[in-house]
Amino acid sequence: FTGSANTGIAINRKLAARPDKLVALEMGGNNPLVVWDTPKLTDAAAIVVQSAFASAGQRCTAARRLIVKASMYDALIAEVKTLADRIICGAPFDSPAPFMGPLIDNAAADGLTESFLYLLSHGGRAIKHLVRPDESLPFLSPAMIDVTGMRERPDVELFGPILQVIQVEDLDEAIAEANATRFGLVASLVGGTPQDYNRFWAQVRAGIVNWNRPTIGPAHAAPVGGVGLSGNHRPTGYYAADYCAYPVASGEMEQPRAAIGVGLR
């Protein structure tokens, strides 16, 4: 199964009394993208925008949380906002071609709007407001909101173009923030040294861990899946055959050949 955590949990519960059924769940994520020491802010901003807003944020691997070193916060956020302001949102065959299209339906757009307003009313600070140009259609603009000061952040997958931003002081705090979720699908580090990435890779809790790459677009030649509420096995990618089938042991000889050497009268 590939889909939301709630649906995956319901499927798992339904099949709990059926040990003959293999249940491989690839569910959603509250995915972190950490931007660390890098002078390449334009490239970092492009990775952030691709991760958060491609497909209008409707990918299980989309970045939901941007974790930024405080010393580079202003410069990076300015770059990301400038790029996000240029995004064209429209129908697939519009001209010029859009970067992102609509949400799946109006109900999804309504839910995302309510979620953004909730974050605002509970201590979030809007960096880029969520805008719905036509209330009768499910098109939403990319949105960014700083939630550093929120006392309690909902640990849910906001399946759309809302990016929550968090400031941190050091890499230990960044990794702690990245792991502050029940999910564990994908995490990316942008910038930093090879030593920083080795530390990030070893300590972050996710099934897919990237360096200087977007959170989206996992290589399906490798295992694809997560931990926690993101899933239990790897139903897609390289290990799909292991988790979506069962192994069969077989012993063979060209001809039947046997003899009983002891214990006979």
Where are these regions (language model features)?
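Periplasmic-binding protein-like
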Residues: F1-T2
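ALDH superfamily catalytic-core signature
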Residues: A5-G149, W211, A259-I260
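Conserved C-terminal structural/oligomerization subdomain of aldehyde/semialdehyde dehydrogenase
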Residues: V34, L117, R132, F139-R265
